[in-house]
């Protein structure tokens, strides 16, 4: 659920609210896109900082800090009446997402039996999918009732849930860890360079990041502005994508263990252009099916 706060609430939920907040705040697509990009840039900077911080602080401390930042960012977004404060909130949420996500797989894996630890990342991905389902369903319903101004109420709801989860996380979650080894450099590049094929991996992950920035950031806007979908229809497509993420994460984790990570990644990257092309047509039923496949690929 912490993954849902850091990613679904603090990052990916922006895409489903994009048309509403753009029209309600009276800003251009360029400005709205800049806000979304600032969120992603903050996440990127956060990953570099976390690689250094985790060599000095315990993982649980880093994850708590991320949850605090994500919650605070959602609070700023919920009270924002102008773009600058909204951008500030999303930048904080982006940083928080990095502080949350990087330690989370280790903490989750340590809580599972040894033969189930490979499912940790998949379960975290399922949490993100669950968060996307919630955000898209809530935003679709509130936008139908309140109109474009509903985006603020959606962020208020997300902030309330994040605050409750922060309290529960602080009270309940525990993680045993020896004192961190100090001396790691900023960004963790020394450790990264020890991995075989680290350059292709970086390129592949960068392409993946670029794809989700474009797809999740403009998914709803593309369907509503260019394909003429109504709010409920675009929200349904976003919801189906989130549902697929819930089941796709553990599914692809198991598949990669059986057939290898390289083959699984190659299959996913090969399917990307096919699925995106179908969505770009805007034809209702095929686009809904493609949204489901897209959710699996994001997993």
Model-derived segments and spans:
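Extracytoplasmic gate region of multi-pass secondary transporters
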Residues: 14-15, 198-239
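Helix-breaking motifs and short loop linkers at transmembrane-helix boundaries and internal kinks
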Residues: 26, 58, 79-84, 228, ...
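Juxtamembrane intracellular "pre-TM" segments in multi-pass secondary transporters
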Residues: 175-201
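C-terminal membrane-cytosol helix-exit motif in multi-pass small-molecule transporters
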Residues: 159-180
């Amino acid at each position: 659920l912490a993954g849902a706060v850091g990613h679904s609430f603090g990052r990916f939920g922006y895409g489903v609210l994009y048309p509403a907040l753009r029209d309600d705040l009276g800003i251009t697509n360029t400005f709205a896109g800049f806000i979304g990009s600032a969120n992603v840039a903050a996440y990127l900077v956060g990953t570099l900082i976390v690689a250094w911080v985790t060599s000095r602080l315990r993982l649980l401390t880093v994850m708590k800090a991320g949850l605090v930042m994500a919650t605070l960012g959602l609070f700023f977004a919920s009270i924002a009446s102008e773009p600058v404060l909204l951008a500030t909130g999303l930048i904080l949420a982006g940083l928080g997402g990095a502080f949350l996500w990087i330690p989370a797989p280790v903490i989750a894996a340590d809580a599972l039996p040894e033969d189930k630890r490979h499912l940790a990342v998949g379960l975290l991905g399922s949490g993100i999918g669950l968060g996307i389902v919630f955000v898209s369903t809530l935003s679709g319903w509130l936008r139908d009732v309140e109109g474009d101004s509903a985006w603020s109420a959606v962020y208020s709801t997300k902030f309330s849930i994040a605050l409750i989860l922060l309290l529960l996380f602080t009270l309940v979650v525990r993680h045993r860890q020896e004192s961190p080894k100090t001396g790691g450099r900023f960004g963790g590049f020394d450790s990264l360079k020890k991995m075989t094929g680290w350059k292709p991996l970086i390129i592949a992950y960068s392409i993946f990041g670029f794809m989700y920035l474009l797809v999740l950031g403009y998914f709803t806007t593309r369907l509503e502005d260019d394909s003429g979908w109504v709010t409920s229809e675009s929200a349904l497509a976003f919801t189906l994508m989130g549902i697929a993420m819930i089941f796709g994460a553990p599914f692809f984790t198991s598949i990669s263990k059986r057939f290898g990570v390289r083959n699984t990644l190659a299959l996913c990257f090969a399917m990307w252009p096919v699925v995106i092309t179908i969505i770009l047509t805007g034809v209702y039923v095929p686009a809904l099916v493609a949204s489901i496949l897209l959710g699996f690929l994001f997993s």
